[in-house]
């Protein structure tokens, strides 16, 4: 598909230093590169109501991956058992989540926090204001943007001290009531204009 693309839409935070030359190859083939200010979650998500006070035993949604995805090799880290102690867990594991997939984002928003191996779930959770501990070596431009924009994302990588990052995450849970989320750019409108569509809501 990349060889046939006339137009390519990437976010403004696209990091060409980690894309293996993909974007430059498309540009050299004559594709027109368009930039969207925002993350993909800003196109399909809406900020949701979330708990303002953390439960005495924090309610945490935990997302584990199967690990057979195209990007998973070298990125997925085991979630340390120590960070799962003292919480009420909702299992949201890939391929084993028992709830309604269409209500997944709403389910996440009703928790005090998220612990995830999935960069997608982590990004969507923090966009909704849910403090999230991402356990992964993944490097993505959108993760850097979420951090720099002030969303409640905590990243545990293989070279980090588990106890330090875990302590930061726990402290972040208790700042939820004073968390002032950044305004979202109007990514939905930008995307609608790009595809020549009109928003109906």
Predicted regions and their residues:
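Catalytic donor nucleotide-activated moiety binding site of glycosyltransferases and closely related
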Residues: 62-64, 78-101
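A nucleotide-sugar donor-handling region in carbohydrate enzymes
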Residues: 6-74
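Short acidic-hydrophobic, aromatic-tinged amphipathic segments that line or gate anion-handling sites
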Residues: 33-37, 97-99, 152-162
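Donor nucleotide-activated moiety binding/catalytic core segment of transferases
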Residues: 93-121
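C-terminal amphipathic helix plus adjacent low-complexity
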Residues: 171-201
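Structural loop-to-beta junction motif characteristic of Rossmann-like glycosyltransferase folds
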Residues: 6, 113, 129-133
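A conserved, positively charged/aromatic
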Residues: 1-10, 108
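Catalytic binding pocket for nucleotide-activated donors in carbohydrate/polymer assembly enzymes
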Residues: 127-176
């Amino acid at each position: 598909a990349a060889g046939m693309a006339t137009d390519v839409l990437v976010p403004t935070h696209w990091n060409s230093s980690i894309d293996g030359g993909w974007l430059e190859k498309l540009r050299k083939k004559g594709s027109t590169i368009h930039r969207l200010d925002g993350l993909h979650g800003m196109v399909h998500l809406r900020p949701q109501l979330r708990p303002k006070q953390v439960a005495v035993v924090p309610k945490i949604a935990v997302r584990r991956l199967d690990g057979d995805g195209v990007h998973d090799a070298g990125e997925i880290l085991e979630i340390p058992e120590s960070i799962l102690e003292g919480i009420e867990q909702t299992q949201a594991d890939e391929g084993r989540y028992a709830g309604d997939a269409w209500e997944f984002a709403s389910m996440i928003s009703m928790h005090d926090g998220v612990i995830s191996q999935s960069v997608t779930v982590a990004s969507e959770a923090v966009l909704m204001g849910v403090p999230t501990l991402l356990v992964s070596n993944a490097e993505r431009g959108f993760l850097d943007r979420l951090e720099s924009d002030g969303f409640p994302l905590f990243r545990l990588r293989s070279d980090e001290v588990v106890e330090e990052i875990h302590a930061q995450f726990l402290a972040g849970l208790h700042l939820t009531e004073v968390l002032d989320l950044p305004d979202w750019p109007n990514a939905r409108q930008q995307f609608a204009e790009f595809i020549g569509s009109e928003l109906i809501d």
